[in-house]
């Protein structure tokens, strides 16, 4: 996907809307998302677009994949497959942030090309003031 292409998914803000969050929580309770469970969700939530329901199901799958790498952040962050493939493990990001602060002190840091923002998150946790910059507008939102 080129940076100028429209995102193939609903905007991250749509995935954070109250109805979408409720549906994400319901999907988290399923051991597996199947075509029949998606059809049931579409039937039970006619006010939500099929594209949004599919995107929420994708988020549930990505959360499962992301949990070993970023822990509980996977439950609340909006994820994207390509960025998830490159994401720094949270424990590694925290270690690096701690080392940076130990050696240089907590100061202002720019994370250019921050992706999902795990390194930025860890730097902020360590006491840094972080400017997180992402070129991809979908990820940046």
Regions found by a protein language model. Name each.
Residues 1-141:
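SAM-dependent transferase fold signal centered on methyltransferase-like domains
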